[in-house]
Amino acid sequence: IGNMLQPLYLGIPCILMSPEAFLQKPFRWLQAISRYKATTSGGPNFAYDLCVNKITDEQRASLDLSSWQVAFNGAEPVRADTMERFTAAFADCGFRREAFYPCYGMAETTLIVSGGGVSAQPILQNLQKQALEQNRVVSALRQKDDSQTLVGSGQCLPELEIVIANPQTMEPCQPNEVGEIWVSGPSVAQGYWNRQEQTEQTFRAQLRNTKAGRFLRTGDLGF
């Protein structure tokens, strides 16, 4: 959807690469961005780690990543240290930290649910680990062993609604309380094909008391 239907809709060139080709040699991905002057490309967080770990200094010297405006990072937890390592490794190739685009989405929502502003710096929050384990969001004054840095996934798309709900009580969470991410909007699928029971449980959640909904239960935690 994001990398095939969108270019067709916009009438712009799109270069495709198989996941196998990337995994065999991560350099191929950045080489393609450099060769074709790509402006938008991305992948899961681990893809950026692979590039840092596998691409040699000699290979880096041949790259020009200055055209890369949106480096989307999603499909799994986005890690602050990965972004910092990648930026440091490829800054001399023209890569800019503000190109990183942490985002959140899933197939059931026709891809994207939230994302940051283009060219905006990723938003980081340093939080207390012990509080997170208790589903509470408490800021840590500085980075240390008992803290954890989380990367924000931007703002909800205008046509979508996100609520954070307690998965046990089905009630809205309080501010600064971790809960399950629920999504509602026109891009949310109607359900799973020929799976009525699973569709009812996943796509038709309602908040207790308010009866607001129907929401898609993502199974992911957020605040």
Q: Can you say where each PLM-predicted feature lies in the sequence?
A:
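Hydrophobic alpha-helical scaffolding
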Residues: L16-F22, Y36-S41, F72-R79, V151-S153, ...
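Gly/Ser/Thr-rich phosphate-binding loop
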Residues: L10-I12, A38-G42, K54-S147, E161-V163, ...
